[in-house]
C-alpha cells in the first residue's frame, strides 16, 4: 500500500505592473497588486508546517505573503498648481481607482481560492477520515497536520481580513483626502481667477496712471509755454512802461520849462508894467515941474537909480525863481529815481518769483519720477499740483491786473499832464496876446512927435538905448502882427490913451 505526499504552497506577491499569476493545478496560486507611489509599508509573511505522511515521511507546507502599501507625501500648498499638475493628479486618481478595482478583483479571486482551499481541505479531511479509517494512526497524524495548517490558514484569513479592513480605512482616507484636494483645487482655481481679474484691474489702473502722467507732462509743457508767453508779455509791458516813463520825463521837463518861461514872462510883464507906470508918473511929474538943467540932471539920476533898483529887484526875483525851479526839478528827479528804484525792486521781485516758479517746476519734475513708482499717491499729488498751478494762474492774473491798472493810472496821469500843458499853452498864448497889445499900445503912443521928444529928453546922451527901445518896439509890432486880434484890449484902454494924448499936447505946448 503506497502513500502519496502532497505539498500545498500559497505565495502572494504585490508588484506595480498588476500581473496575476494563478497557481498551477490545485496545489497553489499567486497574484500581485501594487499601487505606486504608496510605498510606505511592506509586509512579508511566511509559514511552514511539517507534513507527515502515513509512511512516516515529512513534507513542508509553506505560505508566503507580500504586501506593500503607502501614500506619497501630499503637498501643503496648492496655490501654484497648474493645469498640468491637475491633469497629473487626475491621471493618478484614475490609475489608483483602476488599481483598487484590480486589487478588489484579485482579492475576490483570493477569497474564492481560499474557499476552494477550504473545500479542498474538506475533501482532504474526508480523505483523511477515510485514511484514518483505513490506516488509523497515520490518519490521526494527518488530521493533526491538517488541523494545524487549517489553524494557520484561519489565522492567515483573519490577518487578511484585518489587512482588508485597514485597506478599506486607508481607501476611505484616500477618498476623503482626494475630496479635500478637489476642494482645494476648486479654491485654487477661484483664487487664480480672482488673481487674474486683479491683475487685469491693476494693468488697467497702470494704463490709466500712465495716461494721467502723460497728461500731466503735457500740462506742464503747456504751462511752461504759457509762462514763457507771460514772461514775453511782461518784458513788453516793462519796455512800454520804460518808454512811457521816458515820455513822462520829457513831458515833465517840457512842462517845467514852459512853467519857467511863463513865470519869466509874467514877471517880465509885471516889470514892464511897473517900468511904464513909473515912467508915466515921472513924465507927468516932469510935465508939471521946472525943466531947468539941474532938475533934468536930478531926475535923470533918479531915473537911472530907479532903473538900477528895478534891475536889481528883477535879478533877485530871477535868481529866486531859478532856485525854486531847480529845487522843484531836483525833487521831481528824485521822485523819478525813487520810482525807478521801485520798478527795479518790482523787476527783482518778478525775477525771484520766476526763479521760484522754475524751482517749483523742477520739484514737480522730480516728483513725477516718484509718482510713477507710487501710483497709490498719484491722485493726491496731482490735486496738489493742480492747486499749485491754479494758484500760480491766479497770481499771474493778479499781476496782469496790477500791471494793467498801473498802465491805466500812468495813462491818466499822462493825460492830466497833457491837459495841464495844453492849459499852460493857452495861458501862454493869452499872455503873448496881452504883451503884444501892450507893445502895440506903446508903439501907437511912440509914433507921436511929442512922445519921441520926451523920450529923447529923458534918455539924453544915451542914443544907443533909444535905438534899442525902438528896435524892441519894432519887434513887438511884428509879434503883434503874427498873433493878431487885440481889439478888445485896445478898446478898453481908449480913455487912457486920450488922457495920455492930452498930456503930451500940453507938454508939447509948454516946450
UniProtKB/Swiss-Prot annotation:
A GO CC term attached to the entry: nuclear envelope
Region (Tail) location: 450-511
Region Disordered: start-end pairs: 1-32, 479-511
Compositionally biased residues, Polar residues: 21-30
IF rod domain: residues covered: 96-449
Renumbered residue ranges of the record's region Coil 2: 304-449
InterPro entries, per the entry: IF_conserved, IF_rod_dom, Intermed_filament_ifa/ifb
Biased composition (Basic and acidic residues): 495-511
Annotated keywords: Coiled coil, Intermediate filament
Region of interest (Coil 1A), ranges: 100-135
Record region (Head): 1-99
Tagged with keyword Transmembrane: no
GO molecular function: structural constituent of cytoskeleton
Region (Coil 1B): 146-284
GO biological process, one term: protein localization to nuclear envelope
Region (Linker 12): 285-303
Biased composition (Low complexity): 483-492
Task of the protein: Major squid neurofilament protein.
Family in the record: Belongs to the intermediate filament family.
Name of this chain's protein: 60 kDa neurofilament protein
Organism the protein comes from: Doryteuthis pealeii (Longfin inshore squid)
